[in-house]
Amino acid sequence: MRIPFVAAVLVGSTLFAAGVFAQDRSHPLPLGTFVDIYTDQSVTSAQKEIGLKEGTWYEGTITVTDVEYYKNTGTGEPFAEIKDMNYRGGCYLLLFRVQDTAKALALKVGDKVVVRGMLSNIGMQTTKYVLVCETRYALFKECEILEIVKPGK
């Protein structure tokens, strides 16, 4: 009985702190904090929706699992989405939308990339990426690729 209570208090405190310190691009929260909460199967979807506020900036290292390119199909500029699907459960997909398509298109699967981005949306859908479960995704926009670390370096 004590362990679930302590876990709930810790998750609640972390969610509250993340909301209080929602900030600007120059003071991002650690992406690892987002990932820990978002992939924690004991945290409800409602708690995630409330605690992981859209508009919050995060920065951290991801592992590239795919990159997709989107052409200018109207008034918008072309962009690329860097995908990271390397989380426990396998049903979590982080999408990082970047305007620097040249850097994004140079990435290879397995590259480690330090990114900074603003949480835009979290949700759930059935996708082609995971057939055994519904994929929970988080979309980050206005992302910057800060550093690329190739495997083995």
Regions found by a protein language model. Give the residues of each.
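Positively charged n-region of N-terminal signal peptides that target proteins for export
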Residues: 1-5
